[in-house]
Every structure is written in C-alpha cells, then in structure tokens.
C-alpha cells in the first residue's frame, strides 16, 4: 500500500508540472531573447566587421571614439563656439569606403559646398552627431560605422553594411 501511495503522489506531481507547463505559467515572456541583460545588449549593439576594425586600428589609431561608434580625428581646429542646435551648415567633404579607400563622392570635385540643417535628420546620423560638436573652419576625418551611415541596406552606390570615411570641413554656419 505504501508503494502505491508513492506512485500516486509521483503521478500527481508529474501531472501538476505538465499542467503548469501546458498553461504557460513557466514560459518566458520573450523566449527568443537571451535571458540576461548583458547578452541581450551584446546581441543588439552593432559591431564592425573584423576587417573594418583592423583597418581602423591600422589607419586611425589615435581617433577619438564616441559611445555611438562614431570616430574622428581633428585635422585642423576651428574657431568660435560649437554649432548651435538646428543651425544651417555649409560644409565641404570627400567620402570614401573604409574597406577599400575608394572615393564615392566629393563636394570639392563639384566645386560647390553642401548645405544642410544639423539635427534635422536630412543627412546620415554620423554627420548629425559629428557636425554638432564642430567649430567654424574645423577640419576632421570622420570614420562612420555602417549603423550611423546607410545601415544594413545601403543606398545607391553605397553597399549594405559599408563603413565610411569622410574628410570634412565646416566652412560656415548660421
């Protein structure tokens, strides 16, 4: 009789566990996501390819790095106050691919500077972030990772996940 009660108790326990699992009480809210916060952040934060990271360390070892992933080297300091929010900027630039160094665009070649409003979202995120801290006349080399440039899809002649290098000059703002 005693053995029968153990088997009966074990049966009830297994039935209870099966019922709980079936109703979803023990299910995670997001089963496809990692369980801990650190793993989730690592999966969500974009990373440079190994090739791009190697080129970056070789060509730009002294580049300043922002938390967003934007890197820059100040080539010539500017004068005056930093760009105010919402200012209209006049800039010259030459854009190239980090991976190959091939130039894809240049306002210098056209002989006409480019004008845009900082922070309005009309240019790539890396430009909005970089130009917001520059001063009139300043020249920088911007190393912009793909997630601050044209992203996972690319655009026009820019392929997907392309990290870019810009030689920029803040000519004026108002």
List each model region and its residues.
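Cross-family detector of peptidyl-prolyl cis-trans isomerase
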Residues: 1-174
